[in-house]
């Protein structure tokens, strides 16, 4: 019984550490993307850091918002934009390694989920609230 508790505690510590890294990296990406679209492409965007668990980027002209929410207890990251909804969860695989699941519009997406896919989802969500043409 102690071995099970020890394994669960170790897995929780791994998930907590990976989740904290993802929160930091994704938050940085949200800030960079909002700044890039505002300064380089003229999008009327405003970043709102509600707290460390919720960030939103708002189109100041239309009021449309993209939100990025972090649930540290469940190790879930939710990314929403106009017509965009992704959910990522930090899990421990059967082999005891940290991994991720990804759902798009509530449906589990098969295949390998990477940090790059999470950052792409952030870009898509923020880009979805602008009226800018897609870059060539």
Predicted feature residues:
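Contiguous, amphipathic alpha-helical segments that mediate oligomerization or scaffolding
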Residues: 2-47
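Intrinsic disorder/low-complexity polar-acidic segments
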Residues: 49-136
């Amino acid at each position: 019984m102690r071995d099970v508790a020890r394994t669960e505690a170790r897995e929780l510590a791994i998930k907590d550490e990976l989740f904290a890294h993802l929160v930091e990296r994704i938050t940085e990406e949200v800030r960079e993307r909002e700044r890039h679209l505002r300064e380089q492409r003229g999008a009327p965007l405003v970043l709102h850091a509600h707290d460390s668990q919720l960030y939103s980027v708002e189109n100041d002209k239309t009021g449309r918002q993209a939100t990025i929410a972090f649930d540290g207890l469940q190790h879930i990251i939710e990314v929403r934009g106009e017509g965009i909804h992704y959910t990522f969860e930090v899990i421990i695989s059967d082999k005891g390694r940290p991994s991720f699941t990804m759902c798009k519009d509530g449906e589990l997406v098969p295949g390998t989920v990477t940090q790059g896919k999470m950052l792409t989802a952030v870009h898509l969500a923020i880009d979805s609230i602008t009226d800018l043409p897609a870059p060539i």
